[in-house]
């Protein structure tokens, strides 16, 4: 083990190493998959357009896809930051995407009371990084029976995620995914320690790499967060070479005019070529591991 200390009860609570999301298998040894979509749900029309475009790309590549969009960006830098269309308006849109396009859905939950409602239309409940230690939220998400995807807090060591896994598994749900999105490195800056990927994998859970929030500059623009999307492909290649179950990539047709996280979102026009390259990296990395 990479983490130190005596064996405790949480060390005996094991997550599923292979998690099913519909027909998709998410595992550290399975082919690379992706959670992808715009940062926030801007409108029904935009969500359907993005989901349709991503489905076409995934179909051409033979890539497992879970559609991502947030109904509420509850941790915006400033009070005036746009937060999304809200839960009431988002639920029928998520349901429509699932039913008409056949795509599984992942979205964030911020409060325990949201979990049951969101679970009606989402296949995966995502716990934001800032909330990853909130026990009531983790337990409520786990008890829905949906897959629980937890982002590692920017303030946590990779091995500390064993305690997060134990909260979810100990609540009766072994289907948990862990996500690396970088660690705070001074002010307004994140850095990714790639050692954290295999360290989190030691929990037994599939590990996802968030390639777009990893290049975020939190609060870097004063009233909003900055970022540098040039480094999304760089970090994604590194993570896939190390070995991950999947990627998390926020993408948008016009990220420079997106209501949130524009500086670190990948332009949709670049998504297909990048994923084709990363799938080739993944095949090499996992063939080497299997050998």
Where are these regions (language model features)?
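Glycine-rich anion/phosphate-binding loops
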Residues: 40-54, 85-92, 226-234
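N-terminal amphipathic alpha-helix/helix-capping segment at the start of soluble metabolic enzymes
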Residues: 5-34, 283-290
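Alpha-helix-loop-beta-strand connector modules within alpha/beta enzyme cores
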Residues: 54-56, 60, 82-106, 141-147, ...
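Active-site-adjacent loop and "lid" segments of alpha/beta metabolic enzymes
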Residues: 80-88, 101, 124-131, 187-194, ...
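Catalytic beta/alpha-barrel core
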Residues: 85-86, 100-114, 123-136, 147-158, ...
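Glycine-rich, proline-tolerant flexible connector loops at the mouths of alpha/beta enzymes
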Residues: 38-47, 65-87, 251-262
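Catalytic alpha/beta core domains of metabolic enzymes, predominantly
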Residues: 144-251
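Short, well-ordered coil/turn segments that N-cap beta-strands
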Residues: 29-32, 61-65, 99-105, 121-123, ...
């Amino acid at each position: 083990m990479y983490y130190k200390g005596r064996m405790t009860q949480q060390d005996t609570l094991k997550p599923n190493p292979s998690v099913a999301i519909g027909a998709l298998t998410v595992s550290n040894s399975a082919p690379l998959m992706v959670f992808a979509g715009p940062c926030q749900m801007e409108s029904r029309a935009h969500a359907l357009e993005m989901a349709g475009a991503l489905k076409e790309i995934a179909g051409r590549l033979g890539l497992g896809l879970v559609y991502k969009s947030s109904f509420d960006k509850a941790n915006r830098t400033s009070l005036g930051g746009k937060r999304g269309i809200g839960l009431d308006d988002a639920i029928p849109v998520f349901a429509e995407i699932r039913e008409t396009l056949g795509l599984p859905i992942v979205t964030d939950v911020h409060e325990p009371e949201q979990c049951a409602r969101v679970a009606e239309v989402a296949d995966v409940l995502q716990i934001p990084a800032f909330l990853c230690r909130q026990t009531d939220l983790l337990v409520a998400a786990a008890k829905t029976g949906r897959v629980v995807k937890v982002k590692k807090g920017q303030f946590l060591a990779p091995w500390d995620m064993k305690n997060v896994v134990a909260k979810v598994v100990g609540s009766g749900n072994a289907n948990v995914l862990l996500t690396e999105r970088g660690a705070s490195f001074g002010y307004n800056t994140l850095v990714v320690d790639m050692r954290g990927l295999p360290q989190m994998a030691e929990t037994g859970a599939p590990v996802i790499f968030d390639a777009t929030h990893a290049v975020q500059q939190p609060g870097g623009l004063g009233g909003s967060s900055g970022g540098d999307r040039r480094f999304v492909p760089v970090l994604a290649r590194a993570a896939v070479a190390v070995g991950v179950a999947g990627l998390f990539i926020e993408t948008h047709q016009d990220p420079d005019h997106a209501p949130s996280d524009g500086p670190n979102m990948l332009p949709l026009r670049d998504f297909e070529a990048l994923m084709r390259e990363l799938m080739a990296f993944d095949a090499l990395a996992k063939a080497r591991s299997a050998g």
